[in-house]
Amino acid sequence: MKITKITTYRLPPRWMFLKIETDEGVVGWGEPVIEGRARTVEAAVHELSDYLIGQDPSRINDLWQVMYRAGFYRGGPILMSAIAGIDQALWDIKGKVLNAPVWQLMGGLVRDKIKAYSWVGGDRPADVIDGIKTLREIGFDTFKLNGCEELGLIDNSRAVDAAVNTVAQIREAFGNQIEFGLDFHGRVSAPMAKVLIKELEPYRPLFIEEPVLAEQAEYYPKLAAQTHIPLAAGERMFSRFDFKRVLEAGGISILQPDLSHAGGITECYKIAGMAEAYDVTLAPHCPLGPIALAACLHIDFVSYNAVLQEQSMGIHYNKGAELLDFVKNKEDFSMVGGFFKPLMKPGLGVEIDEAKVIEFSKNAPDWRNPLWRHEDNSVAEW
């Protein structure tokens, strides 16, 4: 079997799908994208296709190493996202050829279900509470919320009080009937993170995500030493080498690699194993589409330390398409009691509605994240 063609489809709301075709008619799908930089990743995918056309798709490990090491310059969000989507599609092909789900090819199940959580948008307490109520009706009891709006490098007590007030109202509204993590989104400087985390401790969040930016990772162990709240990070780390430094330094309790950013299934399985050796849990980052989610689920079901799975059903980013709009076998992604079951169909287990993908790709938007500014007009972290 040989790879004959690679096609990319930019799609709403902010996704990109990839299709790999073979000379035997077996097709694999992947999801390579950086939110807001889809065209750049698309260019990287097509540059990498020179290494793939005419090659045997079953040699996943070799093709991964070729894509990573054949260029003198490597790593980073663009290249690793391109590799990630290609890698997902290669695993999809392998599973279809062998008539087995990807998790079966990786040694089989370590669990029968995985807890899902949902992102809840909004900065006003009333909006967040309404969002949680809606999601609870469809079975969720675990959520992730914005931990704060933009903060200055050193900000005033009013800004801290506003963030804490939102969390306090949510805990008061639901008590211990729900669990929620708080996403700082890298918006908070190290000095302000120290202040804000301490003020949030009485409300016992499940975790605090990206308390500071990944490039400030030296602060993770310092912040962790000052709080009992587990710290989470990883969506802006792109290879096992990025994660190695964080694991060695300590401080992170929950690792969040993104299967569409950090080299795909091949790389993230290695990252999961590294995390387990450090007694760090796994909760893959996934605010993206159905192929990315499927890839995450296969890792979850073969990784002992996987504890939570993010998913984007109903997320406020989903303008123009919902999580399962391009999927034919929607029932396979149904949740029971807030848990996902293993995907049982061969490969990734996603049946893509290709005609719909082609139609929606014709006028796909170029999504950009908001550009925020502080009161003094300097650029703020989003």
From Swiss-Prot:
GO BP field: amino acid catabolic process; D-galactonate catabolic process
PROSITE patterns reported for this sequence: MR_MLE_1, MR_MLE_2
Pfam families associated with the record: MR_MLE_C (PF13378), MR_MLE_N (PF02746)
Marked site: Transition state stabilizer: E310
Residues of the site described as Increases basicity of active site His: D258
Pathway(s): Carbohydrate acid metabolism; D-galactonate degradation; D-glyceraldehyde 3-phosphate and pyruvate from D-galactonate: step 1/3
Role summary: Catalyzes the dehydration of D-galactonate to 2-keto-3-deoxy-D-galactonate.
Protein name: D-galactonate dehydratase
Gene field: dgoD
